[in-house]
Amino acid sequence: MSHLLDSVDAASLRSDVPAFRPGDTVNVHVRVIEGNRSRVQQFKGVVIRRQGAGVRETFTVRKVSFSVGVERTFPVHTPIVEKIELVTRGDVRRAKLYYLRELRGKAAKIKEKRDS
């Protein structure tokens, strides 16, 4: 039974997802449907967590908009997400960056990872 579920899950996995980790800054293009119209909205922020595996994998992006922190959780393999752009790589030592919620201003900035 699990082999059948794995094959169904593999059919709905996306192949165009970049390799990103918590601490990275990403630009998520989300399809928003308003009435009978649809448009693409961008949500740019820092990935604070990545959770799950396979079809159920999700990631949470945090940004500060007009001095209010906004977090949004997206499924990785959903068709609502048009594309995920990796803007910068962050240098962090944790897998879950919940401590960023308490920080303000420059303290909430993440160092950029240097290519070596």
Swiss-Prot record:
Any Gene Ontology biological process: translation
PROSITE patterns: RIBOSOMAL_L19
Residue stretches in coiled coil: none
Highest taxon in the source lineage: Bacteria
Keywords carried by this UniProt record: Ribonucleoprotein, Ribosomal protein
Any GO MF annotation of the entry: structural constituent of ribosome
A cellular component annotation (GO) from this entry: cytosolic large ribosomal subunit
InterPro entries, A to Z: Ribosomal_bL19, Ribosomal_bL19_CS, Ribosomal_bL19_sf, Translation_prot_SH3-like_sf
Family statement: Belongs to the bacterial ribosomal protein bL19 family.
NCBIfam families reported in the protein's UniProt record: rplS_bact (TIGR01024)
Biological role: This protein is located at the 30S-50S ribosomal subunit interface and may play a role in the structure and function of the aminoacyl-tRNA binding site.
Protein name, entry field: Large ribosomal subunit protein bL19
Organism taxonomic ancestry: Bacteria, Bacillati, Actinomycetota, Actinomycetes, Kitasatosporales
Encoding gene per record: rplS
